[in-house]
């Protein structure tokens, strides 16, 4: 390799075994060989291995070649030679005017083909785009004499001098007043003819100054005068915001007083009293609609103290109580007298009738004043179950709970069922004689173990 024979200066071997000289660029022959292999379609990694040049060096050389078309090394720390010479810029402008849709890389190839530039001095694609953007397509507000491409405009395009431009007509020059002016939008009276003429003159002067400033780069640059709002204009603009958009939400004080007069406080109190009267009366039963439902009147004074006393059950009570309970109790609620006659007070009443047994776990229930205490039975029992069956689960109570007459052998007397036989209702007649079927008749003898276990379920 030619670059391996370089021995001048500080050199060495790279990671691929190729010789290099520190601080010196790669030889011209190696650079050209890299470009040739790239044109042949060899990958940069293969070029790096074949020429024993680092991959970064190959990529940098190829990238610079694709960008500028030159394989010469750049000057480190120095400035590049100017490639956008006036001759090159003029040629680029000519190409672009002849074919406005021409791409930058086509312009670059044409510059090389016509010999305007060589591979070292040809501008890059990005440079050509920058030249087209900044020098060929001049902005409209640049001076006429400083434009490079002024002399070579297309025949169909002409530039109009600024002196021939008619200033825009002021919206207030109309004698009747423009609807789109500030005064027209705000509904303010138009000023006099003299004032309008002065305003028109000042607007036209400001427009002319702004346009003339574009044709002279030395003069001071003045912008169009912005419309300033007077105090009268500001007050007219603030008026819509001072009005209430929602009068119902923010009513005036007089409106509020009128509303209060329509609904005085005594009228509201009487309406509340009428509403209370329409509520459920004391005689209306609460809870479930039971056949043997009993109600009690509400105590007149809910704050009166109550005394809870225990009474022993009557001797004639036939209720069966479990043997585990030592004694049963009945609750009587009696209003404590306040010193008045006995007839004036509410007569004592029983919360539960004497026929119902009350266990110890029910003696601690809270008493709710103002509500009715209903039902002759304990909670959880249907109304048709006699009270004697609510005390325990003895066999006699279970026999009383299910009446055997309801399941007798007689046919139904009801018309829809009179045509059906006994076999239709009870296809298996052995169910009626089963020891587990409860009837009013005596139960047939069954094994004591099974009967006892069933009774205690």
Swiss-Prot record:
UniProt cross-references to InterPro entries, sorted A to Z: Homeodomain-like_sf (IPR009057), PAIRED_DNA-bd_dom (IPR043182), Paired_dom (IPR001523), Pax2_C (IPR022130), PAX_fam (IPR043565), WH-like_DNA-bd_sf (IPR036388)
Q: Where is this region: PAI subdomain?
A: 12-68
Residues carrying Phosphoserine: 304
Tissue spec:
Expressed in the developing excretory system and the thyroid gland.
Please indicate if the UniProt record lists Nucleus as a keyword: yes
One Pfam annotation reads PAX
- List residues annotated as DNA-binding: 9-135
Q: Where in the cell is it found?
A: Nucleus
What quaternary structure, including any partners, is listed in this protein's UniProt entry?
Interacts with WWTR1.
> What protein is this chain from?
Paired box protein Pax-8
- Gene name, per UniProt, is Pax8
């Amino acid at each position: 390799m030619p670059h391996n024979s370089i021995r001048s200066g500080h050199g060495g071997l790279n990671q691929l075994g190729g010789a290099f000289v520190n601080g010196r660029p790669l030889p011209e022959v190696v650079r050209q060989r890299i470009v040739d292999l790239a044109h042949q379609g060899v990958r940069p990694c293969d070029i790096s291995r074949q020429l024993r040049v680092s991959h970064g060096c190959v990529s940098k050389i190829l990238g610079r070649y694709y960008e500028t078309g030159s394989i010469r090394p750049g000057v480190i720390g120095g400035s590049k030679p100017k490639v956008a010479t006036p001759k090159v810029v003029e040629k680029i402008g000519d190409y672009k005017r002849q074919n406005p849709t021409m791409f930058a890389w086509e312009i670059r190839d044409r510059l090389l083909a016509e010999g305007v530039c060589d591979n070292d001095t040809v501008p890059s694609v990005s440079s050509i785009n920058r030249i087209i953007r900044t020098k060929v397509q001049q902005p409209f507000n640049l001076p006429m004499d400083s434009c490079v491409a002024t002399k070579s405009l297309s025949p169909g395009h002409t530039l109009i001098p600024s002196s021939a431009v008619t200033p825009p007509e002021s919206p207030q020059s109309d004698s009747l007043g423009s609807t789109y002016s500030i005064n027209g939008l705000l509904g303010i009276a138009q000023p006099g003819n003299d004032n309008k003429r002065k305003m028109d003159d000042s607007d036209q002067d400001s427009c002319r100054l702004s346009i003339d400033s574009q044709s002279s780069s030395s003069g001071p640059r003045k912008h169009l005068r912005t419309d300033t709002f007077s105090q009268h204009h500001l007050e007219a603009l603030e008026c819509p915001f001072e009005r209430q958009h929602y009068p119902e939400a923010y009513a005036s004080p007089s409106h509020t007083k009128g509303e209060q007069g329509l609904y005085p406080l005594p009228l509201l109190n009487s309406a509340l009293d009428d509403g209370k009267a329409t509520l459920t009366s004391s005689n209306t039963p609460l809870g479930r609609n039971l056949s043997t439902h009993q109600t009690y009147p509400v105590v007149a004074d809910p704050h009166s103290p109550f005394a809870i006393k225990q009474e022993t059950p009557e001797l004639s009570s036939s209720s069966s109580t479990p043997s585990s309970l030592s004694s049963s109790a009945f609750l009587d609620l009696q209003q404590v007298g306040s010193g008045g006659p006995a007839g004036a007070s509410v007569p004592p009443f029983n919360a539960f009738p004497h026929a119902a047994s009350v266990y110890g776990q029910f003696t601690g229930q809270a008493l709710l004043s103002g509500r009715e205490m209903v039902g002759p039975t304990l909670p959880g029992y249907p109304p048709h179950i006699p009270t004697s069956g609510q005390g325990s689960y003895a066999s006699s109570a279970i026999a009383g709970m299910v009446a055997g007459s309801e399941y007798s052998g007689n046919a139904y007397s009801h018309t829809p069922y009179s045509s059906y036989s006994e076999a239709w209702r009870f296809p298996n007649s052995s169910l009626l004689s089963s020891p587990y079927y409860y009837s009013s008749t005596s139960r047939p003898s069954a094994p004591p173990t099974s009967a006892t276990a069933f009774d205690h379920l």
